[in-house]
């Protein structure tokens, strides 16, 4: 048995030795059956090698990469102005393109060199110049607007919120040909990308742990970052804040007369649109501007978006100390009294006497008729009265039964529609015309004043008419009024020659001054001022010097 075992082992090794040549022969057969590389691959590699040859005149130098070829052309053939070898004409084959700057010629060389460093993040296509990539990205934006489906959850992001995709990713929004894929389920995750590439425009992080595509109910159809009006509102409020600071600075420097109604009106005009008195006053302008998030609802994914942004306004230099606030409050009180005293001049002096109606009271000021019979009798105009609103500012009330609308005193559509008999009962001073026989004017409801059909008094100068009206106002008023103070000759000319302020402007001025005083008083109440007062510059003290004794003889100075 022991003798048979050694003989069996060589028998078992024999097939193994016989199999080795067969494997070698098979491998040799497989190597022999491998097809040769195709001619198309060889042609492609040859064409790529030919594109890396410099064709500038007779250079014909070969380079390993497109970057090396581009650097060679820019440094060797184009040159630089500093080295005095700048060439602005392209000599690639027969191009002969001439430019005016070195940047232009280097950008033009990219057309000939197969260098495409600018790659599209959506489809992976490369471009030679950045302007070509920019035009290509616009085509993606147009396709996303035209081909977006109604069920697309990203529809509210607008055309500017692009997604990031790879050139070969199966879940990309665009395929290699630029067509939109139907698999839109892969775009529900906004913060990571399966292909590992970043998006062209990065998405903001979702605040408060909410969903990315949650749309607040009070916003428009655009996305959260595009529909947020915080920055534009802050700019407008900043402009109003600057106007308010300039106004307070002019008050401190006394650049206009607070006792002149014309000066006060002109100084308040820039603040009418900036203060927004009708929509909340100036309280919000003094404090910080904060866009608050919408109220929480029962929806679990509802988030406030990026609305929780704070915009802090800079400190107001003109209202820095307590002394500034008290001084400006006194000036505003003086301005308010000036506007309040000039309330009777609002309804236009060209249409009647400028002081025939006092807008501060319910009852008009009685004025006796003038001495002459050639002028109509003075009577109050049917202007509405002024009452105080909840905010302390005057408001307009509906017209009451101040006039009995009879056939003799019915207001016409304009001053031209009044009959001679009714003109005596109106507030317009015209010469009395002879009564025409026939029917009187039809009773209508309308205004007694017409801004278009303005007429001047005939037979008398305007200056004499104003003097007569002023005398009549002094004689008829229960309390004689003092002469209107004018701060400067320019203000006198403005008050006499220009059109008087309308009733709406007077009300707006009153509301503006009241809102400014509320702002100043609120700052004083809250203590929003610096405790350190400004150093007061005292005038220099004059001291008398003793008279020096004059010498008996004049002294000669040696030069």
UniProtKB/Swiss-Prot annotation:
Motif YPX[LI] motif 2 per record, residues: 553-556
Subcellular localization, as worded in the UniProt entry: Cytoplasm; Nucleus
Compositional bias of kind Low complexity: 407-427
Region annotated Disordered, chain positions: 1-47, 181-202, 339-430, 459-505, 527-559
GO biological process terms, semicolon-separated: positive regulation of transcription by RNA polymerase II
Bias (Polar residues) ranges: 375-391, 487-496
InterPro entries in UniProt: pacC/RIM101, Znf_C2H2_sf, Znf_C2H2_type
GO molecular function, one term: DNA binding
GO CC terms of this entry: cytoplasm; nucleus
This protein's record includes keyword Lipid metabolism: no
Listed Basic and acidic residues bias regions: 542-551
Source domain of life: Eukaryota
Record protein name field: pH-response transcription factor pacC/RIM101
UniProt organism field: Pyricularia oryzae (strain 70-15 / ATCC MYA-4617 / FGSC 8958) (Rice blast fungus)
